[in-house]
Each structure stands twice: as structure tokens, then as C-alpha cells.
From Swiss-Prot:
Parts forming coiled coils: none
Native organism: Heliobacterium modesticaldum (strain ATCC 51547 / Ice1)
Catalytic activity field: a quinone + NADH + 5 H(+)(in) = a quinol + NAD(+) + 4 H(+)(out)
EC number: 7.1.1.-
UniProt topology in membrane: Multi-pass membrane protein
Protein name: NADH-quinone oxidoreductase subunit A
Keyword Translocase: yes
Length: 118
């Protein structure tokens, strides 16, 4: 029974160990010399005038979030479209329900004004 889970266990272990190992190696190899120049903001080689920090509009984040949500739709639609002829009626109904949920989500985002630039 344990042999069945060996492959997924190895992938899980590798997925956890490799990022931590990469961060550890990066931390060990980094340079640690701090100076005043490194702390200054760089803007075309000129000294900045005024406040360099501006408030970031949340509209960009909202557009990105909506884009990712509907981009995932294409990831699921592509394999279904490739095997469309071999799939039965159940798969067609299932995809219809999936697309309906996404259309309702798109309609809700539109209704709430998430797609309007303010």
C-alpha cells in the first residue's frame, strides 16, 4: 500500500525541499555590504524631488485578479475541447455548468463595477 503513495510522496518532498534549499543557498551567497547609496531610490540617475512614494491604485490588483480567474477557465477548457468528440453527454453537461458558473462570476464582477476604470 505504501508503494502506491511513494511517487506522490517524493514529489511532495521535492516540492517542499527545493524552494527552501534555493532560499538557503541564496542567503549564504548574498553580499552583505550595506551603504547609503543602496538605500536611495534610483530614478534615471537623478536625485528625486519630493515624495517618491505614491499611493498605488487597487484597480490594477482587481483587474489582475479578474484576469487570473478567467484565464484559469481557458486552462480547463482546452483539454475538454481537444477530447470533445470522445467525451459523453455527462462531460458536455459538466462543461456547461462550469461555463455557466464563470459567466455568472463575470456578470457579478461587471455588476459590481470591478471592470470599470475609476
Amino acid at each position: 500500500m505504501l508503494k502506491e503513495y511513494l511517487g506522490i510522496s517524493l514529489f511532495l518532498a521535492a516540492g517542499l525541499i527545493i524552494p527552501f534549499l534555493a532560499f538557503a543557498v541564496s542567503r549564504l551567497l548574498q553580499t552583505r555590504k550595506n551603504s547609503l547609496v543602496k538605500g536611495e531610490p534610483y530614478e534615471c540617475g537623478m536625485e528625486t524631488i519630493g515624495d517618491t512614494w505614491i499611493q498605488f491604485k487597487s484597480n490594477y490588483f482587481l483587474y489582475a485578479l479578474v484576469f487570473v480567474a478567467f484565464d484559469v477557465e481557458t486552462v480547463f477548457l482546452y483539454p475538454w475541447a481537444v477530447k470533445f468528440q470522445q467525451l459523453g453527454t455527462f462531460a458536455i453537461v459538466e462543461m456547461f455548468i462550469f461555463i455557466t458558473i464563470l459567466v455568472v462570476g463575470f456578470w457579478y464582477a461587471w455588476k459590481e463595477g470591478a471592470l470599470e476604470w475609476k
